[in-house]
Curated annotation (Swiss-Prot):
Keyword presence, Membrane: no
Keywords: Sporulation
Renumbered residue ranges of the record's region Disordered: 34-80
Family assignment from sequence similarity: Belongs to the Tlp family.
Cell compartment(s), UniProt: Spore core
Major localization class: other
Name of this protein: Small, acid-soluble spore protein Tlp
Keyword Nucleotide-binding attached: no
Example GO BP: sporulation resulting in formation of a cellular spore
Organism: Bacillus velezensis (strain DSM 23117 / BGSC 10A6 / LMG 26770 / FZB42) (Bacillus amyloliquefaciens subsp. plantarum)
Gene: tlp
Length: 80
């Protein structure tokens, strides 16, 4: 009988910093695009955009914190 269970993927964190940096850049671009769209938005839409951009800024801070953690882990050889 064959084993139908999949093997778990190895924990490859080697490119996490780069992925997180890309996520920060993409989020910043989304904020800028949203700000540009406010020119044509209603007051209600502007409020939603501002709220969403506030959440995006919180995400950026979290990403940056994670980048610091991952950079430190990389320097320490990813040891737990």
């Amino acid at each position: 009988m064959t084993n139908n269970y999949q093997k778990p993927n190895p924990d490859d964190r080697s490119d996490n910093v780069e992925k997180l940096q890309d996520m920060v850049q993409n989020t910043i671009e989304n904020i800028e695009e949203a700000k540009e769209s406010m020119e044509f938005a209603t007051d209600e839409e502007k409020q939603r955009i501002q709220e969403k951009n506030a959440r995006r800024n919180e995400s950026i801070e979290s990403f940056r914190s994670e980048i610091q953690d991952e950079s430190a882990a990389r320097e320490n050889g990813y040891q737990s």
